[in-house]
Amino acid sequence: MKSISIPARLLGTAFLALSLTTSCSDILDEQPRSTYDPSFFKTEKGVEGGITSMYAHLRYIYGQAYYYNSCQTGTDEATYGFSADGNFKDADLSGVGNLTASTSRSDALWGTAFSNINTANGVIENGASVGISEALVSEARFFRAFDYFLLVQTFGGVPLDMGAGELKFNINPNRVSVRNTVPEVYTKAIFPDLLKAAENLPEQPRVKGGVTKTVARLYLSKAYLTYAWWLKNPNQIPTYPECPRTDPDGHDAAWYFQQAYDVAVKAIENPGPFGLQESFWQVNAGPNDRNNEILLYADHTQEDEYYNGGSLSYGSGGAPDNFAGWMVNWNYTDARSSDGKSVLIRTAEQSYGRPWNRMAPPQGVFTHTFADKTHDSRFDGTFTTVYRGNWSTNGKTWESVSNANGMQVKEREPIFSFVAEDMDKVNYSEEAAKQNNLGAGTLPGRADWVLGLDKVSRYAYPGLWKLGPYRTDNGSGPGQPNAGSTRPYNIAKFSELYLLAAEAAVEGARTQAGKTARDLVNVLRARAGRWTYSNAEYKEVDRDFSAEMVAATPATIDINYILDERSREFFGEGYRWFDLVRTQKWNEYADTYTICGKLPEQGYNVKTDHTPKTHQRTIKPFHYLRPIPQGQLDGMEMSADEKKAYQNPGYRD
């Protein structure tokens, strides 16, 4: 199948509600250009280039680590790590920073999304007149709805008019802006676009990675579900701009929950080329990237820097690089053997990668979310818990090294492990901690240094294997571990359809035979019991605990169980803040968290402080919306009072 070729230079239009100019790159004929006159959209080539650019814009959102931080930090899945700066501490809401219009990293979404929306407006306005099929125009409809859906969840109501009228292509500078209400954004933009996309997009993608009916149905179901929760408003969270929580079309929350269920089930029953992988491990394994469970991804490649969108040898630390995987990755390279050798080398392998240590999973991730580590493969398929000696990638030819308990360890045998068993038996002696340089301990008869999962800290925690790098050009060396990941960043998965339908069913949707909330959840839980590979054991396995997983599912499923399953299935992928905000469970799930150690700035041996500490977050109702970025406010030619009114309440000082 033909692939979408996306150069580094993104076609798009710049919009911060203050200037709207057109800058395009002709993607399809692979002739890079820096600027075009807006009339270019009145040509077939221009419209096609605009559509291709919409795939490229995904790189400026997904894999962008600071935006990723805004979707994860401050939830039950992540707090700030030992090396975090203000970007991460501000998002944690635990008293070590302050989330404001200037510090919130949701700004990465605002500018990118509106630029793409205006491009989509141009494509939709001009597509038919230049002979572009509705199927192709519907790709633009999908991406316009996609961006508006992200925006309305993040900021509340946002502008539909960028200066030329609602949902019109704007080519003139515009320094004023009026925000539409949440119901207007859903009913005027998101739902109509997704309905047309679901109707007109093909079942088979026109190019590899192209959008289809299935992904349109997933986002339509999710939009219906999110809007239903907004109408229900169980905890009386305020919205902005202020408006009644009523639907302009006269439907109630129950109607939208039903629509969410029906659309998700229709997508499950009409999957096209998509489906579930045999095992959870296969979904996220680098060699299996772009598999048929992935409905949408922000693509990258190791084959060419131009089409990768960034260097193949160093990381810029900014978009369009895919560097989100660096954030939940601790300094494993600090490890030493008992004879003082550096034995864990930074490599471009999925279990290793570049350690930035900006974010850390709290202990509840390991005690609650992933409590079952024996039957449920999702713990093993999410984290790196065993770090194996790889000194040969650094040119060392040692046959073995002396390690814990004076025992010998060979290349690719465990040097260090996080353990869930025998945690009370680990000996955290001062001598061992000094030798291994990690603050780790020993267990009798084991050659690897160990740290119990009850000792997880901001410094040391299992790395997020899911987002680790994978390249085939490493040779016998470390490869290019400092480059952004050349893997695609997965955005939407077929598996989510089951949990969307299950969530709608829990909220009262009438269910079909064989597709109750429990039935739907158990499809994924049964799959989670199927092991084809063990990361910890570093080998293929053939184990089936599907029956045990299904038997352990509660007879009655509630929304908390759905949220737990969503975390087990999609941990660390950028879903969590949206999930907790949608269901208004953020306070319940994340107002406190436990992690070892004091605050880094208090001065102590971060590696050996294994004392758990519970931290309190201050999550107020206004936090359920992010602040409008300061750059947007600064660029508007409006009065101080008008700008204040434009900003979400709680962020105006």
Where are the regions that the model predicts?
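Bacterial Sec-dependent N-terminal signal peptides
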Residues: K2-S3, L18-K45, S221, A502, ...
